[in-house]
Amino acid sequence: MPTETNQNTTQYDLFVSCSQGWEGLLQTELEQLAVGDVKPGHAGVYVSATLEQMYKICLWTRLATKVLLPLDSGPIETGDDVHTVASKVDWPSLMKPGASLKVDFIGTNDAVRNTQFGAQRVKDAVVDSIRHAGGERPNVEKMQPDVRIHARLHRDELHISIDLSGDSLHRRGYRQKQGGAPLKENLAAALLLRAGWPTIAEQGGALLDPMCGSGTLLIEGALIAYSIAPGLSRDKFGFECWTGHNADTWAQVVNDAKAIRDKNLQEKSFDIFGYDSDYYVTKAAEMNCEALGLQNVIHIANKPVEELKQPTHKVLVPGLVIVNPPYGERLGEVNELRTTYQILAHQVKQQFEGWTFAVFTSNPELAKETRLRANKKNKFKNGALPAELFVYSVLSADDAKLRKDKLTQAVQTDEDGQVENASGAWVRKNLCDKPLTEAATMVANRIKKNLKRLKKSVKQNDWHGYRVYDADMPEYSAAIDLYNDQVHIQEYAAPKTIDADKAEARFETLKHGAAVALQAPDNKLFVKTRKRNKGKAQYEKQTDTQGFDAERCIQVQEGNAKLWVNLQDYLDTGLFLDHRPLRMRIHKEATGKRFLNLFCYTATASVQAALGGATESVSVDMSNTYLEWADNNFRLNNVHLARHRLVRADCFDWLNKCREGFDLIMLDPPTFSNSKKMSDVLDIQKDQVRLISRCMDILNPGGTLYFSTNFRQFKLDEQISTRYVVENISAATIDEDFKGNPKIHYCWKIQH
């Protein structure tokens, strides 16, 4: 709490939190900000700061996650004690009228057994306090609250604070796009500090990340080098609706930081380069740089690690090569990554003599593949994963040659599919160029046989997406689909009774055979593992990207329609190939009709209906992402959305409220779903009667309902066959590429 009344000189006792183990780094950072009386604590530091100093901490810290102003504390022996302790705080004097709030509750004990209960009791105390004072009841806002209250229950003692930072300070606000496994921004800053980047930058050294992803290390490196306050790109802070906030003082702190940024960007120059083999993430990195106005400061290029070398257009002052390579979760991935680490280290040794080389990895065993001796090691956490930063000094070429390692052996023997070109750079062979084993030859031959069988259908129907293999050989259990010239492999996870190493080896064989048979280079192979999931779990993301991203998609032609397909981020791609015949049937029958698509996914059937001449359509799904995807599918085909609506809703709720009539309905629900977004659990075997019956209630006379399910044990209820005219059209809705898997789905045509 404050110790003086004058706002400009009032000292606030604050707790500035950070990741465990960073306390020393954070203490040094705050002392450099001229914040006095800094004392290290557990996962943070205690400081005494003026209002202006508090603003500077929020704006300038590269390491902290929260800035908390402690308010009160008390013992918790019963659930009601939470309300009692929180009620001791004079909330009306702390929160501006009308401010929304959120309570972050951490910790439990015998009286408070879950954090939701604790948060609710604190919230009740805040609301009661404000209402008793005659104030307006504050709204609870989970995403972007005006005021965040931090409640921590530790050793039966509840500590209440107001969160002056708001959203976690690692969220700088510049991340427009991201790759598959982005580093948190404050973690990237901590890695750079531990690697010695500030000193290297002061000496004019360069910064280079050969596997830069969406550019977090590069951006944080630039912010450090140019002394740019990381908080300048944030839209909102937690203190803005705190009554102690002084807008004039805050504006001055911000303006001072902007002046420093502008001056340094004009007067200083640093060489900062980032490369990545993934074209899409380099575009994401460029967008993130542009968000900060650093597009002319940070240079991004699409380049694999095998081609890593210093820029040829200028001589760089030796600096820092820092990298966060993949660490691998599967045996095959780890084995492949050993080669990646070897190549990375080889290129650094060849090209960056006299530089500092830093490798951050969650698999320290892979770091050994560099065959370098670390000057220092620092332990970190990357999310929940233990990780380590290895910092090396790159020896001269002569010194490096004194140490023989297996890297050289790999180059000479070409056993692992690598070759060394005339310039000494390493080039990794594509999987499709490597010699086939006997087992991989069998797989390749089976796929070639399937391609030959499908050739006529592909040509006649102009297929651009089709299945070429579906666990044809039981020991090689996967589905392989071809989209244009890109290959999508979904491995069916092996039963627990199968030895994991054996299953892994079989899958590597399958992948090799597929790559050769389809002549697909590595950058056109996309591999997923399909596990036994419930409901729409198959739709879950494989990466951390957010929403629909056209740059990560390709266009696939289906009849007259162009459809977006994403091979990278989800287990399924946005286009269920087995439903192709049903979509084409809907296309033919939709002319002049009103079409309803329930559980619409990416609304590909709705696009076909619209292009087939449907007068109107309604597509219903609960997922914002898939409705955004559907919107883009419509726009790709120049379909106006005024008459083709996309509705985000629970399909059961929507059906119960629907008073419209439709001529053509597609019902393709998941087998099971217990999504929190749904009002009830969906089990298609149990719920088929009420779901189909409700659809028939809104089906116009002479209309058709197409009901489809992927549940292999599904049995159509006799009530449906008795009430309506039902025709099993499953066989007619399975094309040649799925004939080997006739139970891929069942489909019925249902009419009055």
Curated annotation (Swiss-Prot):
InterPro entries: 23SrRNA_methyltr_KL, RlmKL-like_Mtase, RlmKL-like_Mtase_CS, RlmL_1st, SAM-dep_methyl-trfase, SAM-dependent_MTases_sf, THUMP_dom
EC nos: 2.1.1.173, 2.1.1.264
Subcellular localization(s) per the UniProt record: Cytoplasm
GO cellular component entries: cytoplasm
Predominant place of localization: cytoplasm
Annotated signal peptide: none
Reactions catalysed according to its record: guanosine(2445) in 23S rRNA + S-adenosyl-L-methionine = N(2)-methylguanosine(2445) in 23S rRNA + S-adenosyl-L-homocysteine + H(+); guanosine(2069) in 23S rRNA + S-adenosyl-L-methionine = N(2)-methylguanosine(2069) in 23S rRNA + S-adenosyl-L-homocysteine + H(+)
Any one GO MF annotation of this record: 23S rRNA (guanine(2445)-N(2))-methyltransferase activity
Keywords, sorted A to Z: Cytoplasm, Methyltransferase, RNA-binding, rRNA processing, S-adenosyl-L-methionine, Transferase
Top-level taxon of origin: Bacteria
Pfam families to which the protein is assigned, alphabetical: Methyltrans_SAM, RlmL_1st, THUMP, UPF0020
Gene3D superfamilies noted in UniProt: 3.30.2130.30, RNA methyltransferase domain (HRMD) like (3.30.750.80), Vaccinia Virus protein VP39 (3.40.50.150)
SMART domains assigned: THUMP
Domain THUMP residue range list: 53-164
SUPFAM superfamilies, alphabetized: S-adenosyl-L-methionine-dependent methyltransferases
Family to which this protein belongs: Belongs to the methyltransferase superfamily. RlmKL family.
Role noted for this protein: Specifically methylates the guanine in position 2445 (m2G2445) and the guanine in position 2069 (m7G2069) of 23S rRNA.
Name of the protein this chain belongs to: Ribosomal RNA large subunit methyltransferase K/L
Annotated source species: Saccharophagus degradans (strain 2-40 / ATCC 43961 / DSM 17024)
Gene that this sequence comes from: rlmL
